[in-house]
């Protein structure tokens, strides 16, 4: 059985509240779970103690049993000091898009054309 430690959404529309659960990866997101390990309330301020609550002993037990945390839960565990911080690489994140590259090329060509006659006139 492939285990995951993940978020199960609760709360009402536009008012999310999540339970941190250990569940079988084949079960639905909000469906059956094996154990509730904590809660996460994204509506609270980031510095609030009640924003993320976890039973770290049980989390470590499930990690020892081979449960894989999802990306968001892994970040929570890194912040709590349970898991080592994974290095993330978004190499394409900062790269400009296709249209921006084309605009930059056109701008560079225009500037080169504008500077070329001025340089020739200055050298004569």
From Swiss-Prot:
InterPro entries on file: Ribosomal_bS16, Ribosomal_bS16_dom_sf
Any single GO BP term: translation
GO cellular component: cytoplasm; small ribosomal subunit
Molecular-function GO term, any one: structural constituent of ribosome
Keywords, comma-separated and alphabetical: Ribonucleoprotein, Ribosomal protein
Keyword Transferase (UniProt): no
Basic and acidic residues composition-biased segments: 84-110
Sequence segments annotated as region (Disordered): 84-124
Positions with biased composition (Low complexity): 111-124
SUPFAM superfamilies recorded: Ribosomal protein S16
Cleavable signal peptide: none
Family designation: Belongs to the bacterial ribosomal protein bS16 family.
Protein's recorded name: Small ribosomal subunit protein bS16
Source organism per UniProt: Paracoccus denitrificans (strain Pd 1222)
Lineage: Bacteria, Pseudomonadati, Pseudomonadota, Alphaproteobacteria, Rhodobacterales
Gene: rpsP
